[in-house]
Regions:
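Catalytic or ion-coupling anion/metal-binding cores of large enzyme and transporter domains
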Residues: 1-197
Length: 197
């Protein structure tokens, strides 16, 4: 969404960069007040689509669906399960992190983090959106490198081709439900089938 300064979004809990992140963020917030740059100035339908795309490429939490929809509605934008589903069908899962993959978020950070992931997504992301630091998303991810291509997969060799999260509808979920197929245990696939025999 553009609220955090570049390079800090997935900083591990024990990393010494937290003090630097707090200092730089505090300074930037004060500058934003002087510039009259409000969080609402950073939000748009495009920024929410970028956020959804990023969550899907991470095979992020199904809770992110609820949170992003709530934030969008609160800010006056339209985001619903149908839009999540449409975006999910075209976004590959590039982050080989748990529970869908084998690495930890700490490994993801040291492999290049969110900047590298967003850069790897290429044209699936609209780089024209503005960030809290006043630069565009494209400017912020320009030059980002992937340091471990098994943790952050290239777009041509994703962990999963698409559907990091899927939206389910039907008589059991008339208003919709969300599932994360890449994290499901394939040996228990039978739990999701209905037998008509």
């Amino acid at each position: 969404l553009g609220f955090i300064l570049p390079g800090f979004s997935s900083t591990p809990a024990a990393d010494s960069r937290h003090a630097q992140m707090a200092t730089l963020s505090g300074r930037r917030i004060v500058d934003m007040v002087w510039e009259d740059l409000k969080p609402s100035d950073l939000l748009s339908d495009v920024s929410f689509d970028n956020a959804v795309t990023t969550v899907l490429a991470l095979s992020g939490s199904s809770n992110s669906v609820v949170h992003l929809i709530a934030m969008a509605r609160r800010a006056g934008f339209t985001l619903d399960l149908a839009r999540f589903d449409a975006i999910a069908r075209r976004v590959p899962v590039l982050a080989n992190v748990r529970p869908a993959g084998k690495y930890l978020m700490e490994d993801f950070f040291y492999a290049g983090g969110l900047r590298a992931l967003v850069s790897e997504l290429g044209d699936l992301i609209d780089g024209s959106t503005r960030n809290a630091n006043g630069k565009t998303l494209a400017e912020n991810v320009g030059g980002a490198k992937v340091y471990n291509a098994d943790v952050i997969r290239p777009r041509g060799a994703p962990l999963v081709e698409s559907d990091g999260l899927v939206v389910l509808t039907g008589n059991l979920a008339p208003r919709g439900a969300v599932m994360k197929p890449p994290a499901a245990d394939p040996t228990r696939e039978w739990l999701f089938r209905v037998r008509w025999e």
